[in-house]
């Protein structure tokens, strides 16, 4: 669980904002949402496999786009 130390003369709103940022960075909310309901091991494997395929296709798409731009002589973005 993320924790912060409240600085001297620090407004409460700013401390809350820092705490929220720390929680987001640690992935607390996404972990809570993931654990809200039980997920069967087979469903978890399917979800992870689908995510891996999606990442792979996204990477291929980016590479193809970059290759097309190189062939056309356009600078990369």
From Swiss-Prot:
PROSITE patterns found in the cross-reference section: RIBOSOMAL_S21
Domain of life: Bacteria
A Pfam short name: Ribosomal_S21
InterPro entries to which the protein is assigned, alphabetical: Ribosomal_bS21, Ribosomal_bS21_CS, Ribosomal_bS21_sf
GO molecular function, one term: structural constituent of ribosome
Keywords: Ribonucleoprotein, Ribosomal protein
GO biological process: translation
The keyword Ion transport is assigned to this record: no
Gene Ontology CC: ribonucleoprotein complex; ribosome
Family statement: Belongs to the bacterial ribosomal protein bS21 family.
Name of the protein in its database record: Small ribosomal subunit protein bS21
UniProt organism field: Methylococcus capsulatus (strain ATCC 33009 / NCIMB 11132 / Bath)
Gene designation per UniProt: rpsU
């Amino acid at each position: 669980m993320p924790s912060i130390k409240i600085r001297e003369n620090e407004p409460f709103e700013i401390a809350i904002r820092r705490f929220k940022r720390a929680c987001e960075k640690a992935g607390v909310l996404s972990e809570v949402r993931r654990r809200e309901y039980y997920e069967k091991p087979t469903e978890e494997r399917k979800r992870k496999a689908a995510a891996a395929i999606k990442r792979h296709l996204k990477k291929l798409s980016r590479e193809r786009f970059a290759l097309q731009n190189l062939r056309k002589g356009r600078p990369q973005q």
